[in-house]
From Swiss-Prot:
One of its GO terms (cellular component) is cytosol. Its EC number is 2.1.1.182. It is found in: Cytoplasm. The keyword Hydrolase does not apply. GO terms for molecular function: 16S rRNA (adenine(1518)-N(6)/adenine(1519)-N(6))-dimethyltransferase activity; RNA binding. Keywords: Cytoplasm, Methyltransferase, RNA-binding, rRNA processing, S-adenosyl-L-methionine, Transferase. S-adenosyl-L-methionine binds at residues 12, 14, 38, 59, 83, 100. It comes from Metamycoplasma arthritidis (strain 158L3-1). Belongs to the class I-like SAM-binding methyltransferase superfamily. rRNA adenine N(6)-methyltransferase family. RsmA subfamily. PANTHER family: DIMETHYLADENOSINE TRANSFERASE, DIMETHYLADENOSINE TRANSFERASE-RELATED. This is Ribosomal RNA small subunit methyltransferase A.
Amino acid sequence: MEVIAKKRFGQNFLINKAIQKAIVDVACVDDENVIEIGPGLGALTDLIKELSKELIAYEIDNDLFKKLLVENQNSNVRFINEDFLNATFDEKKEWVVIGNIPYNITSEILFKLIENHSILKKATLMVQDEVANRLVAMPKTKEYSKLTVSVNFVGNVKKHFVVKASNFNPAPKVDSAIITIDFYKSLPYNLKKVLAFIKQIFAFKRKMLINNLVPQWPKADVIWAIEQIGHKQTTRAEELSLQEIMKLYEILVNSKSN
């Protein structure tokens, strides 16, 4: 059964076997419960299924889903014909995630993983190289953003290697990269509230931090909090490290006049 990549699903199939193996090596699956996002032609699936305790693969493309079922009739893989963004997970188990994810919904997938961090151990993902650079960006750089801080709040992010566009069929217009997120067992603050705070301070990147915060907190409290973390009133969100952002959040939440 010949399968043609569908643009609407953002499909680019990784055809380099050495890189396929390298991705699985980075994932380091060892008798664990695995979720695969977009198995596609099943290249990574074939390698992972021998290493996993349980493997659930979400494939939105009905044609690929049928092909995968035929080729994996006697395996331990459970294929689900569903958009990963609509998926629900068994919260009684700990999962590791792997996938060459559709680049047009990368942020949505990352935030779904963030929301489910408590049942996740690790994620190994193929993303655009530009996105990978954003995820590991340092403060005071143009790549540093809401996404950077949000993902790093729930886990340790590492960029492993770049995958050139020529290793895919069809070849995308940009290079890709492999990243991992090792999720923290617990978080120091409420996830929903912290994500809302991060969104607020990065709402208008050109605005000073104080102007993004004053709608919710009194100006005097904001000025005092910014000074407490060693910054000036003119500071912008992209100048703060994750640790400084969390300290600022803690001070403001505990401020007497809030």
